Regions:
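Short, hydrophobic alpha-helical packing/hinge segments within bilobed ligand-binding/sensory domains
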Residues: 85-91, 97, 106-107
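Acidic, polar ligand-binding/catalytic clefts
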Residues: 1-48, 105-132, 244-247
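Extracytoplasmic small-molecule ligand-binding "clamshell" domains
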Residues: 1-9, 196, 209, 213, ...
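Conserved C-terminal helix/tail region of periplasmic/extracytoplasmic solute-binding proteins
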Residues: 219-249
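Extended ligand-binding regions for polar small-molecule ligands
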Residues: 38-43, 47, 52-53, 58-61, ...
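Bilobed "Venus flytrap"/periplasmic-binding protein-like clamshell domains
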Residues: 11-12, 30-90
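Ligand-binding cleft/hinge of the Venus flytrap
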Residues: 24, 62-83, 112-119, 156, ...
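Sec/Tat-exported extracytoplasmic proteins
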Residues: 2, 7-10, 14, 39, ...
């Protein structure tokens, strides 16, 4: 009960959803496991990592995916298993291991913010291979269905708002829209808030204070952030991505 919601790089898996007392919300970020290497290693593909020493965290999907990938490629590797993220990074940057593997978003973050001087971010590259599906989603305690619904539909509201062109700058103007879907989303036509047990202005408040999904993505991890991650699979379905919200109706 110390934490109401965990929003981290936590992958939604069957066993986590069924056996650990969690319920997961909507997928907030479609990630995948990648590899960070120093440029001086001279490799441009994960398929060139035969015999490499790899830093990885224990008890994670990352550790299992790593073994599966190397086995599937008929390559060998030497794992350096370290529990704390800070210690993994220190081991990698000190040269104790050739490769650091985790979710690609984590690798972008590490490269942007954790490279110790005199080294620079440009001294390290993220290899092109993504070797797993890592759908990241917020986790809540199993058994509180209303709260789980609120968490889930808050994400959907941000996606639906982006799809319909509602953002933090125009949300007040959008209150005047005659589009029936926009009127439902913003609570001008009441009922959706009541169904969730929240104020009818719940979506308006999210968008006004936080922005739609695209705004949040760009600000925190996208081109408006130090990470500069391309949206990729996290584009809306209308733009070739996987992000898609059920109708708010």
């Amino acid at each position: 009960g110390e934490v109401d919601m965990l929003s981290n790089n936590t992958t939604l898996t069957l066993t986590r959803d069924t056996a650990l007392g969690f319920d997961f919300g909507a997928v907030t970020y479609y990630d995948g496991q990648g590899f960070l290497v120093p440029k001086k290693l001279g490799v441009k593909s994960a398929k060139e990592l035969n015999g490499a020493t790899v830093c990885v965290a224990p008890g994670t999907t990352t550790e299992l995916n790593l073994a599966d990938y190397f086995r599937g490629q008929k390559m060998s590797f030497k794992p350096v298993v370290i529990e704390k993220v800070e210690e993994i990074r220190a081991a990698f940057f000190s040269g104790r291991c050739d490769v650091y593997t985790t979710d690609a978003s984590g690798l972008y973050s590490t490269r942007a913010a954790n490279v110790p001087p005199p080294a620079k971010a440009d001294d390290f590259i993220i290899l092109p291979e993504i070797i797993s599906k890592e759908p990241l989603a917020p986790a809540v305690r199993h058994g509180d269905q209303q709260f789980a619904d609120i968490v889930r539909w808050s994400q959907y509201a941000m996606l639906e708002s982006e799809e319909y062109g509602i953002d933090s700058k125009n949300v007040d103007e959008m209150l005047k829209s005659e589009n029936p879907t926009i009127k439902r989303i913003l609570g001008v036509t009441p009922g959706m808030g009541k169904a969730l047990g929240v104020d009818e202005k719940w979506v308006y408040n999210i968008i006004k204070q936080v922005g739609n999904y695209g705004e949040s993505f760009e600000r925190n991890v996208g081109m408006g952030s130090p990470l500069k991650i391309d949206r990729g699979l996290n584009k809306l379905w209308t733009q070739g991505g996987l992000q898609y919200a059920p109708p708010i109706r």
